[in-house]
Structures are given as structure tokens and as C-alpha cells.
Design a protein with these regions (language model features):
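Intrinsically disordered, low-structural-confidence terminal and linker regions
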Residues: 2-23
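Extended, alpha-helix-rich binding/interface surfaces that flank or overlap catalytic cores
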Residues: 19-95, 101-112, 118-208
């Protein structure tokens, strides 16, 4: 994921969070039904500026906030590859913003396994290996429950201190510094049938 794609993802994340805050504070932001149609032809001509068009239906539909069962259930209308792409997108957005600690601490940590599987599936093996080092340090597996992940981080921090943060920092730096092929786009455009979509989903909009 190059810097332009990443900036687009982070911008959307900021806008999404801002809209939620406005809803809470002013009640001026509401949800609306958005219709989208992504055909094989659309996907084959995809570029980095329209990358999030592929992700947005999953982003708005698949829940990461209500437990693992709901996460899987809310993803039922999408392909496995679409679910993996969402997990990878969440991973990059969170790690690039606040590191692996933030990714695991926040609700986004629920997608940790799909992120690793997605990296492997999309032939992004360098990313898979980098994240696997963090998972291995956490004992080889990570809970899908946020409270359990929070306690895991507390225990590791208390037990290993600076060593723990060194492992995280090294994994973070890899994400910040890595310049590789655009494997997500390559995979999507090589397998467009896995990412087609037609339907409606709820999204936020500002009434002002």
C-alpha cells in the first residue's frame, strides 16, 4: 500500500470518526443508504485513487465492534477475499496511525487473523512475516475479544517492558519504511470476480 493509498484510507477513517463525533455532539450527521455497483470492468481499470471504492461497502457493513460472531455474520454477503481486504485495510490504517499496540488495543484487533491470512493470500508475504513476529511474541495466537487483548498487552508490558516495545517498534518501522509492489491492487485486478459488488449499504452523511 503506497503513501497515496494509505493517505486516502486514513482520511476516510478521520472523516468517519469525525462524523460519529458530530452525531454524538450535535445530532447533525445521519446515516443514509448508498448504492454501489462494482463490475469486473470497473475493477480491472482500478487505480490507487479509487482503491477505497472497493473497500467502502465492507467498511460500512462489516462490524468489528460487537464481537467475533457478529464480525463473521456481518461479512456473510461478501467473499473471503473482500473480508481479507478489509482486514488488511484496517491493519494498515491503525498500525500507520499508532503502531501495532494501537491496532491490537482497539476494536480493530479482532481482524488480526484475517490480516495475516489476507497477506498470505494476496502474496504479501513480507507483511505476513513481519506481523507474525508480533503474534509469536504474544504467544502464537491473539484473542478476538478486546478485553482479553487489553489484558494481554498489560501483561506483556509488565513482564517484558522495553523488550516488548522494541519488538513492536521494529514491526511498526517495517510498515512505515517498506516500499514494495502494490500487491493489493495487483491481486484485486488479477481476480476482479472476487471483488464485484452491487447493492446498498449504510454510510454517514452531514446534513449541513
Amino acid at each position: 500500500m503506497n503513501m497515496m493509498m494509505l493517505k486516502n484510507v486514513l482520511l476516510f477513517l478521520d472523516i468517519d470518526n469525525e462524523n460519529i463525533e458530530e452525531t454524538n455532539e450535535m445530532g447533525e450527521t445521519q446515516k443514509k443508504l448508498t448504492y454501489a455497483k462494482l463490475t469486473i470492468e470497473n475493477i480491472k481499470s482500478l487505480d490507487e485513487n479509487s482503491y477505497f471504492d472497493i473497500v467502502e461497502p465492507m467498511w460500512e457493513t462489516i462490524s468489528i465492534y460487537d464481537g467475533y460472531d457478529e464480525y463473521i455474520q456481518s461479512a456473510q454477503t461478501f467473499t473471503l477475499e473482500q473480508r481479507y481486504l478489509l482486514a488488511i485495510t484496517w491493519y494498515f490504517a491503525e498500525v500507520s496511525n499508532g503502531g501495532h499496540y494501537q491496532f491490537l488495543y482497539n476494536p480493530t484487533g479482532i481482524v488480526w487473523e484475517d490480516a495475516i491470512k489476507g497477506f498470505k493470500h494476496f502474496a504479501m508475504n513480507e507483511y505476513a512475516d513481519n506481523f507474525q513476529k508480533v503474534v509469536d511474541y504474544c504467544g502464537g495466537t491473539i484473542s478476538f475479544g478486546r478485553e482479553e487483548r487489553y489484558h494481554m498487552l498489560e501483561i506483556l508490558e509488565e513482564k517484558y517492558g522495553e523488550e516488548f516495545f522494541k519488538i513492536l517498534d521494529e514491526a511498526d518501522d517495517f510498515i512505515y519504511d517498506y516500499e514494495g509492489e502494490e500487491n493489493e491492487l495487483n491481486y484485486i485486478k488479477s481476480h476482479p470476480e472476487k471483488f464485484v459488488f452491487e447493492g446498498e449499504y449504510e454510510s454517514f452523511y452531514n446534513r449541513r
